[in-house]
Each structure stands twice: as C-alpha cells, then as structure tokens.
Swiss-Prot record:
Localization per Swiss-Prot or TrEMBL: Secreted
Keywords: Amidation, Cleavage on pair of basic residues, Disulfide bond, Hormone, Neuropeptide, Secreted, Signal
Modification after translation: Pro-MCH is processed differentially in the brain and in peripheral organs producing two neuropeptides; NEI and MCH. A third peptide, NGE, may also be produced. Preferential processing in neurons by prohormone convertase 2 (PC2) generates NEI. MCH is generated in neurons of the lateral hypothalmic area by several prohormone convertases including PC1/3, PC2 and PC5/6.
PANTHER family (alphabetical): MELANIN-CONCENTRATING HORMONE (PTHR12091), PRO-MCH (PTHR12091:SF0)
Organism of provenance: Rattus norvegicus
Domain of life: Eukaryota
Cysteine disulfide links: 153-162
Tissue: MCH is present in all regions of the brain and in neurointermediate lobe of the pituarity gland, with highest concentrations in the hypothalamus. Also expressed to a much lesser extent in stomach, lamina propria of both duodenum and colon, ovary, thymus, pancreas, adrenal gland and testis (spermatogonia, early spermatocytes and Sertoli cells). Weak expression in heart and lung. The other peptides are expressed at least in Sertoli cells, nei being also expressed in brain, stomach and proximal duodenum. In brain exclusively mature mch and nei peptides are present.
Record protein name field: Pro-MCH
C-alpha cells in the first residue's frame, strides 16, 4: 500500500512539473519597469513642484513613451507587447498576473520631494542629532557615517548583523 501511494505521489509530481513546462510565459524587461518607475516619479515631482502655478495651461510632454537606449532616446511603441520566452517557466512566479502595475514606493509631498530647498532645516536637525548623540559612539564615527551604516544594516545590504554597526 505504501508503495502505491509513493508511486502516485511521484506520478502527480511528474505531471505537475511537465504541465508547467509546456505553458508559455510573457515577460517585460526589468529595465523597462525601472524606467517606468523613474518617469512616473519624475512626473509626480514636477506636478507637486508646480501645483501652486495653476494658471499655466501648457502641459509638458510625457516622457513615458521613451526609453534610454544605446542609440539615444527613441520611441518605444513596439515594446508595449509582451515577449514570448518559450517554455522557460519560473515556478516561484507561476500564477502571478502578467501585467503587474508597478507603483512608486511613496508619493512624496512638499519639501521631501526637493530637499535642496530646505538645506537650512537639514543643518539644524543635524546639529540637534550631534547634541543628543551618545558620547561613547560619537568618538568612534562621525554622526553621518554612523547613521549611514545603520540604514545600510536596516536595508539588508551588508553582510553583518545590525548589532555590529
């Protein structure tokens, strides 16, 4: 009986693997997805910057249809179609919709969009951090370096645990 259940599991496993191998998949290059994110963020930043000048009725041309290629900027009409990658099927991404709408992480408003305008405010907050900071850690690193290392640790871009920072 155990041999029959083991062979039935093997048969189901083989069937599922082979059925996924025949399916066609469509993909969009990561470069184009990242370009879309950058252009959407750029347009949002411009909209927030010019929201107080509502009397202007001229609309800026959209950069969404263009991409940066080796030959320069060119129209991206034919890249809107999905590409057939054959029977290469990634089992992790199986079942996800083909047209995922990629949105920017955060829609920044006000002075966070253009930090160059609030340079005086940044200097004051840095000065407050220096006055409040730990005495034993401030001797080892300057304040900016310590904050940068902690942020890198929190993002997981380094190969050491957070407590070593």
């Amino acid at each position: 009986m155990a041999k029959m259940s083991l062979s039935s599991y093997m048969l189901m496993l083989a069937f599922s693997l082979f059925s996924h191998g025949i399916l066609l998949s469509a993909s969009k290059s990561i470069r184009n997805v990242e370009d879309d994110i950058v252009f959407n963020t750029f347009r949002m930043g411009k909209a927030f910057q010019k929201e107080d000048t509502a009397e202007r009725s001229v609309v800026a041309p959209s950069l969404e249809g263009y991409k940066n290629d080796e030959s320069g900027f060119m129209k991206d009409d034919d890249d809107k179609t999905t590409k057939n990658t054959g029977s290469k099927q990634n089992l992790v991404t199986h079942g996800l919709p083909l047209s995922l709408a990629v949105k920017p992480y955060l829609a920044l408003k006000g002075p966070a969009v253009f930090p160059a305008e609030n340079g005086v405010q940044n200097t004051e907050s840095t000065q407050e951090k220096r006055e409040i900071g730990d005495e034993e850690n401030s001797a080892k690193f300057p304040i900016g370096r310590r904050d940068f290392d902690m942020l890198r640790c929190m993002l997981g871009r380094v190969y050491r645990p957070c407590w070593q920072v």
